[in-house]
Amino acid sequence: MSTSGVLDTINTHLASVTNPTPQVVVRGEPILLNASPTFAYWIQSHSEDFETLGDRSTSLSVTIRCYWRLEQAQQVKEALELEVYNAIVSIKQKLSADALLGGNCQYSICGTADTGYIEQSGITFKIVTIPFQIDVYSEETITP
């Protein structure tokens, strides 16, 4: 079990979403959004759950965020809402189907997806944010 394996597996699952297909998947919060949709994920927090005599088990909170460049036409906005919904369902299905993330964690679960808007470089983007909680047992070895 490893955090790097967790992150690699999340990347693989996000890249394999086909409805909608991301133009790019970014590990880390994107600085510049050139493609739509862009799927990104990053570590939000890391904490110790419990400790034994030989190791520590941890919880990792990952933020998954999808970005769509917003268009002005009403028909495009209506189609976008369906694409946003499909992205939420597809991402949650991919991650739930592999709750152990390829054997790299003990358990994982998606939280409630939120939608909203952000502006970057004068361009408005529709966003979906999905919190993702991961438990990694025996992640840190304690040596006496």
Predicted regions and their residues:
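Charged, amphipathic alpha-helical segments and their flanking helix caps
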Residues: 1-33, 45-144
